[in-house]
Amino acid sequence: MYFLVADHREHHVIPFLKTDFHHMHQNPIQKNQALLEIKQLFTGDYLICKSPSTILACIERKTYKDFAASLKDGRYKNRQKMLSLREQTNCQLYFFVEGPAFPNPQKKINHVAYASIITAMTHLMVRDHMFVIQTKNEAHSSQKLVQLFYAFSKEMVCVVPTSLTPTDEELCIKLWSSLSGISGVIGKILANTCSVAHLVSGKLPSQNIDQLKTPSNRPFPKKVKRMLISISKGNKELEIKLLSGVPNIGKKLAAEILKDHALLFFLNQPVECLANIQIAQKTRTIKLGMKRAEAIHYFLNWCGSAHVTVDSQNITEASRPTMQVATQPAATQPLHKVSDDASSDASSPTGHQTLSKEMSLNTVRC
């Protein structure tokens, strides 16, 4: 049996891994293979293993800032641990570098030029024979880890591991992440805590926004808090960005829709009314259409695994709930549920070393 071991300090990626592995469990073909274990690792951030104790791959994940810091303080030498592990186990080594693709080479990241980071990445590939994989954010890193895991579990057969169609949750996270400063982790918390409709209708008071925390129990960045409060007060520019995150709605179309009215106005209207909005084009005027209108209502009212239906009669009159802020993502309670309450988890024969040297107990299985 194959399994992926994640270091318990990988707080920002583990929530996405749990979701991605849960989806693998739904596939009968992969049901007995999708196993995630969370332990303390001493080499790398992730290990792809085969029972009982064979290490197949070791993966280290760093953001650009982490990479730059490691170049400055010497932690870049941690690669020696990975090289030593490969010498003992003959495992493959992977280095994930997380962040926006292809910044300006002269751009300073943690006081280190991006060109220097590129040079270090090249050395990892040419000198140390490590696979370097660039990822966009935490969610993308999780997807790449699952793809690697699936490839190893299928003995490197090149197949598509899962459906390329994103889930509603992934689309909603992408919607929140369309706002500057909101990462995939924060977007996931917001997607499972409140809907856009809750925010723009005043159901998420500023004092509750101030209590929101990351999976590591840290407060949201001040910039994000100010932005959420600004949206709740009707900031048109931010509303356009949010609306543009809905599938098949770009920035131009979002700006045209919100040209004369605030986002709350459309959330108060029936879907049929929204579908009849006239959109001016270069040579003609067209209607928004039912499919786009339904997508807007669906994703702006999406919260957790539930689609929240907003009653146009009471969206602005509903009692403001007292939100219960959780410090762990698994305990996060969707805001609409809180509102309702307020109102009514030995060595291998091939010579690979055992895992006991690379991790400690405290296993979490998904």
Curated annotation (Swiss-Prot):
Query: At the top level of its lineage, which domain of life is listed?
Result: Viruses
* InterPro entries documented for this protein: ERCC4_domain, Mus81, Restrct_endonuc-II-like
Write down the top EC class of this protein: hydrolase
> What keyword terms does UniProt attach to this protein?
Host-virus interaction, Hydrolase, Inhibition of host innate immune response by virus, Inhibition of host interferon signaling pathway by virus, Interferon antiviral system evasion, Late protein, Viral immunoevasion
Q: List where Polar residues composition bias occurs.
A: 320-331, 349-366
**Where are the annotated segments for Disordered?**
320-366
Q: Name one GO molecular function term.
A: crossover junction DNA endonuclease activity
Concerning what turns on (or off) its expression, the entry says:
Expressed in the late phase of the viral replicative cycle.
Gene Ontology terms: biological process: DNA catabolic process; double-strand break repair via break-induced replication; symbiont-mediated suppression of host innate immune response; symbiont-mediated suppression of host type I interferon-mediated signaling pathway
Which ranges carry the ERCC4 domain? 3-101
User: Can you cite an annotated GO cellular component?
Assistant: Holliday junction resolvase complex
Known EC number:
3.1.4.-
Family of this protein: Belongs to the asfivirus EP364R family.
Which PANTHER family does the record cross-reference, listed alphabetically? CLASS II CROSSOVER JUNCTION ENDONUCLEASE MUS81, CROSSOVER JUNCTION ENDONUCLEASE MUS81
What does this chain do? Answer: Plays a role in the inhibition of type I interferon signaling pathway. Mechanistically, specifically interacts with 2',3'-cGAMP and cleaves it via its phosphodiesterase activity. In turn, prevents 2',3'-cGAMP interaction with host ER-resident STING1 leading to inhibition of downstream signaling pathway and type I interferon production.
Protein name per Swiss-Prot or TrEMBL: ERCC4 domain-containing protein EP364R
Q: Which organism is it from?
A: African swine fever virus (isolate Warthog/Namibia/Wart80/1980)
